[in-house]
């Protein structure tokens, strides 16, 4: 009976479709073949454990890396409104010196896209943690920390899907 159970578990593991949600380190990711282009799309999401409260509501923040239709994106997704412009984002890796830059605001005002996603992902892959600071509309600076464990695997998957070297 033990062998039958082990065989069934092994078969179910090998038959798992690429397009199912999977986990690597602190990242949840999904890969699937785009039916329109036959290219592989990959999306990886890392949710920060840091939460802030605004107007009585808890606000969550996620870091998203993706290859979609051969385009690489890296962005901060916020359960809040950042404004309609280009948000100023501060990133601090592994307790090092914080670096400020201007990111591109996403449609709807609840996300901010890194100006050079490939460089940003390559930099993430060198570190264990990242603290990202941002100012939601009508609020003060919020800083959230991301445990980047598994980011090297995510970076490799995205680089392969979008045809760039890590």
Locate predicted features:
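A generic "folded-domain core" signal
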Residues: 17-166
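Sec-dependent N-terminal signal peptides
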Residues: 3-14
């Amino acid at each position: 009976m033990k062998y039958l159970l082990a065989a069934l578990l092994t078969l179910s593991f090998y038959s798992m479709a690429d397009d199912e949600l999977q986990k690597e380190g602190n990242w949840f990711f999904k890969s699937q073949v785009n039916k329109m282009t036959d290219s592989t799309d990959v999306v990886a999401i890392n949710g920060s454990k840091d939460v802030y409260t605004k107007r009585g509501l808890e606000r969550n923040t996620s870091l998203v890396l993706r290859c979609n239709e051969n385009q690489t994106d890296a962005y901060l997704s916020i359960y809040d409104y950042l404004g309609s412009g280009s948000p100023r984002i501060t990133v601090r890796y592994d307790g090092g010196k914080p670096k400020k830059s201007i990111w591109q605001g996403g449609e709807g005002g609840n996300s901010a896209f890194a100006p050079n996603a490939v460089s940003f992902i390559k930099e993430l892959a060198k570190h264990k943690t990242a603290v990202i600071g941002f100012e939601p509309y009508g609020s003060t600076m919020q800083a959230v920390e991301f445990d980047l464990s598994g980011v090297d695997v995510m970076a490799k998957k995205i680089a392969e899907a979008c045809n760039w070297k890590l």
